[in-house]
Design a protein with these regions (language model features):
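Short glycine-rich substrate-engagement loop in P-loop NTPases that contacts/grips substrate
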Residues: 63-100
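Hydrophobic anchor at the beta1->P-loop junction of P-loop NTPases
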Residues: 39
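Hydrophobic positions on the alpha1 helix immediately C-terminal to the Walker A/P-loop
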Residues: 50, 54, 67
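Conserved lysine of the Walker
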Residues: 47
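Post-Walker A helix-loop "phosphate-sensing" segment adjacent to the P-loop in P-loop NTPases
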Residues: 55-64
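Phosphate-binding P-loop
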Residues: 7-20, 24-34
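Walker A (P-loop) phosphate-binding loop of P-loop NTPases
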Residues: 44
């Protein structure tokens, strides 16, 4: 939790030093982003829970919480609308930075060559615009897109992640989903609404890292 507390404090401090109206008008928005966090480790280690709790606690509205692949789907959709632009990723990154100071990605995982080829430029532009990245992943940054086609072109994205986030391994040897089952009520009678809610609660606890959608607040 100390990593999240550090980031929270840094973001709050940075919010008190945001550029004023003149700075925005004259394009002085570019600033070094607050260094984010990249949580990686096995399934069931509580990564998503930590980030969800952190996201809800942030005391400002310019924030986004989304599954990584949903985010990339939006990027590709916006690129289609900017087909005539010379630097579409610069424009897209500016749009994201206008919406959010912090972007929280769940399940950061790269398998698509198209995503791999554009992520370096996209991340460079996001960080240039002061966006802070918080991500969860099952894979350490150096293992992303391993053995992928033209992986050398993806390496700048890995370097940017390592430069702009604190890498935190959350493997503790404890699967918190299984711990929940050990404490859960396994026999339900009668089969009423309370029993149904108990089952729903156990289901949510078992699959927290696959239930997140897009949240902007």
């Amino acid at each position: 939790m100390r990593h999240l507390q550090r980031l929270y404090d840094d973001l709050v401090a940075a919010s008190q030093n945001k550029p004023g109206l003149l700075g925005k008008l004259f394009g002085k928005k570019d600033q070094a982003p607050v260094r984010g966090l990249y949580f990686w480790g096995g399934v069931g280690r509580g990564k998503t829970y930590l980030v969800d709790t952190f996201f809800e606690a942030l005391p400002f509205k310019e924030k986004t919480r989304t599954h990584f692949h949903r985010f990339m789907k939006r990027v590709h959709e916006e690129m289609k609308t900017l087909g005539g632009e010379k630097n579409p990723l610069t424009i897209i990154a500016r749009r994201f930075s206008d919406e959010s100071r912090v972007i929280c990605f769940d399940e950061f995982f790269v398998s698509d060559i198209t995503d791999a080829m554009i992520l370096g430029t996209l991340m460079e532009e996001l960080f240039k615009n002061g966006v802070t990245l918080v991500a969860t992943s099952n894979i350490v940054p150096d293992g992303l897109y391993k053995d992928g086609l033209q992986r050398a072109r993806f390496l700048p994205a890995i370097a940017l992640i390592k430069q702009n986030t604190e890498i935190v391994n959350v493997d503790s040897g404890v699967d918190y989903r299984l711990r929940h089952l050990e404490q859960a009520e396994l026999f339900h009678f009668p089969l009423d609404e309370a029993a149904q809610e108990s089952l729903r609660k156990s289901s949510r606890a078992l699959t927290p890292e696959s239930t997140a959608g897009v949240e902007t607040d």
